Amino acid sequence: MNRRNISAFNQQATGKADTLYMDNKEFERALAQVVLGQPTAFKSDSAMVLLESQFKFQSEKHKQANLAWLEQNKKLKGIKTLPSGLQYRVLTEGTGPVATDSSEVEVHYEGSLLDGTEFDSSNTRQQPDTFRQNKIIKGWREALTMMPEGAGWNLSIPSYLGYGERGSGQQIPGNSTLIFKVECLKVKNNPAKK
């Protein structure tokens, strides 16, 4: 049976120092009751400890799965891995200037999660976006200072170079690796020569 180990919960709920185990159905029933504001077999403080513990467990599990994916991805032909952990594959060579920290960059891009869920796309909007180089996530900032105008790259951005443990809104969970297909259309304001 698939069981969930909720450490420290039993201490809060019953005063006993051992660990409580709940199967999936029990956990889902208790979670639904808490969300709906219905009475549960747990004290409200204990229910919060249960939820926090479960979310931390799931977040760590998600983080480890994403790190394992990056380890496998870097072995693929054509993937380059930088010391920071950023991974990229050149799709189209560019010949123009590259961005500096004070540049603005006009790009077309598609962003997705490892499961293929697309969370943003300038291509869908049929309108390129312009970003200030110093106002974007670290993974993009690093890539765009190496990516010449006219280039197209696939980026695999570890969570610590993206949105970290917190994620971003409802679409990007914490500890998510971000996959981007980026086309650098124009480097504006203080470009560096390649």
Short names for language-model regions:
Residues M1-K194:
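Cross-family detector of peptidyl-prolyl cis-trans isomerase
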